[in-house]
């Protein structure tokens, strides 16, 4: 059973009045129940928190974790798309003239990290930091992960949707992001184990050359 939150506090008894009870703290089970109806608590797992990250969490804590989940899901979806694109096509030209390194010379997947010159890595991390600190700001009071980047060209289309449709699309994004996080992790593991990251190809017997 889920443990209850801290027991109610007591004020010490006075010579002039009895002990006064404070308002009972909200139990962990009540907290859990309050999150079971949130977007993302859906089939097939429903509300699933095996690590207890939401134990005794308030709404602010939940929204922080949801923000992180949405962001990581989006990054993982981009990583999957980039991995597949890099496997099939490369940009023309040079990645680094000083290192005499062309885009065509770059390996795919995790192996690419060891080939990027230090100056290139610095640019990548600097750009990510700039986006994180100055551009991708969550809209105050909105769903976690709602960014406004120079105005939203799709705002009118989104606003015209019913609340049910918006909730459905948010749930789809969460599910796709969760699948992508597991997918890119699986590809990275299989790349390191056998240099064959595309498990579906292996299962179907579709041959490919990786790096």
Curated annotation (Swiss-Prot):
Disulfide bonds: none
Gene3D superfamilies associated with the record: Chlorophyll a/b binding protein domain (1.10.3460.10)
Protein's recorded name: Fucoxanthin-chlorophyll a-c binding protein F, chloroplastic
Induction: Levels are increased up to tenfold when transferred from high intensity to low intensity blue or white light.
Cell location: Plastid, Chloroplast thylakoid membrane
Function noted in UniProt: The light-harvesting complex (LHC) functions as a light receptor, it captures and delivers excitation energy to photosystems with which it is closely associated. Energy is transferred from the carotenoid and chlorophyll C (or B) to chlorophyll A and the photosynthetic reaction centers where it is used to synthesize ATP and reducing power.
Recorded family membership: Belongs to the fucoxanthin chlorophyll protein family.
InterPro entries hit by this protein: Chloro_AB-bd_pln, Chloroa_b-bind
Chief subcellular location: plastid
Molecular function as annotated in GO: chlorophyll binding
SUPFAM superfamilies, per database record: Chlorophyll a-b binding protein (SSF103511)
Cellular component aspect of the GO annotation: chloroplast thylakoid membrane; light-harvesting complex; photosystem II
Keywords: Chlorophyll, Chloroplast, Chromophore, Light-harvesting polypeptide, Membrane, Photosynthesis, Photosystem II, Plastid, Thylakoid, Transit peptide, Transmembrane, Transmembrane helix
Gene: FCPF
